[in-house]
From Swiss-Prot:
This is Choriogonadotropin subunit beta 7. High expression in the placenta throughout pregnancy. It comes from Homo sapiens (Human). Its main location: secreted. One of its GO terms (molecular function) is hormone activity. It is found in: Secreted. The gene is CGB7. The lineage of its organism: Eukaryota, Metazoa, Chordata, Craniata, Vertebrata.
């Protein structure tokens, strides 16, 4: 009887491990629709644009004995193919180029975080609002939803991957 219980427990644990490893409930890394705030220094306006960004789950691993073994590289959701679109900000004074470009994710991949194409830091407090305090209350006619993921910034300071410490 004990052998039967042991086999049953082993069967249940192996099935649970298989199901959990597939991560069926977590959306994988893919382009998703997002609303971003767009502003430019010197222009008295901040508007929102609809675009696609890369977001979602990338499988990662961590070591149990972190002090003994070296850290494993962690992958994040990155742009694979990207297109840039431009918009003209209304009301910019003469001498200020009113054209602003932003990224549109065409495809995404799980890879090491590269600062040349990805914001490797934590999420901004309010990724969908303007940075200039003059525009905080009036960045758009409709406030963007607060639940959207933080957008990645393009380009960044270097192409060095971020590894865990």
């Amino acid at each position: 009887m004990e052998m039967f219980q042991g086999l049953l427990l082993l069967l249940l644990l192996s099935m649970g491990g298989t199901w959990a490893s597939r991560e069926m409930l977590r959306p994988r890394c893919r382009p998703i629709n997002a609303t971003l705030a767009v502003e430019k220094e010197g222009c008295p306006v901040c508007i929102t644009v609809n675009t696609t960004i890369c977001a979602g789950y990338c499988p990662t691993m961590t070591r149990v004995l972190q002090g003994v073994l070296p850290a494993l590289p962690q992958v994040v959701c990155n742009y694979r193919d990207v297109r840039f679109e431009s918009i003209r900000l209304p009301g910019c004074p003469r001498g200020v180029n009113p054209v602003v470009s932003y990224a549109v994710a065409l495809s995404c991949q799980c890879a090491l975080c590269r600062r040349s194409t990805t914001d490797c830091g934590g999420p901004k407090d309010h990724p969908l609002t303007c940075d200039d305090p003059r525009f905080q209350a009036s960045s758009s006619s409709k406030a963007p939803p607060p639940s959207l993921p933080s957008p990645s910034r393009l380009p960044g300071p270097s192409d060095t991957p971020i590894l865990p410490q």
